[in-house]
Amino acid sequence: MPQLQGLNHLLFSVSDLEKSFCFYRDVLHAKPLVRGRKLAYFDLNGYWLALNEEPDIPRNEIAHSYTHMAFTITEESFDEWYAHLEKHGVTILHGRDRSERDKRSIYFIDPDGHKFELHTGTLQDRLAYYRDEKHHMTFFE
């Protein structure tokens, strides 16, 4: 049976990136890592915290949000995990199109519609990709 490798990252959908950026930085003392037009990444005491700005969705409609919890899996266990989810009748969602440098993910929902992700990449992989490809972003280190 496949095993989870640990928590990968937390992502929250926010209606106002500036307001949320200040809250997580100033109130929770999260350390800013990168900020783009619609996203920001923090180190929250060793945890990768991501904010995605989604201003036009109802805040009470979870099904419309990209907000999710992601767990780390190995690249080698990716297919095993996919088969495991299918075997248990889990609803697997079509993930966003992404570069190979952004690694691989399986998105799925629980019976109440809460989104989860099994991800093979790391924060360092993502930041390296963004540094090379996303020139509009501001990096803090």
UniProtKB/Swiss-Prot annotation:
Its main location: cytoplasm. GO terms for molecular function: magnesium ion binding; transferase activity, transferring alkyl or aryl (other than methyl) groups. InterPro entries: Fosfomycin_Res_Enzymes, Glyas_Bleomycin-R_OHBP_Dase, Glyas_Fos-R_dOase_dom, Metallothiol_Trafse_FosB, VOC. The keyword Metal-binding applies. Mg(2+) binds at residues 9, 68, 117. Gene3D superfamilies: 2,3-Dihydroxybiphenyl 1,2-Dioxygenase, domain 1. The active site is at 117 (proton donor/acceptor). Its EC number is 2.5.1.-. GO terms for cellular component: cytoplasm. It is found in: Cytoplasm. Residues 6-121 form the VOC domain. Its cofactor is Mg(2+). GO terms for biological process: response to antibiotic. The keyword Flavoprotein does not apply. It is an enzyme of class 2 (transferase). Keywords: Antibiotic resistance, Cytoplasm, Magnesium, Metal-binding, Transferase. Belongs to the fosfomycin resistance protein family. FosB subfamily. Homodimer. Metallothiol transferase which confers resistance to fosfomycin by catalyzing the addition of a thiol cofactor to fosfomycin. L-cysteine is probably the physiological thiol donor. This is Metallothiol transferase FosB.
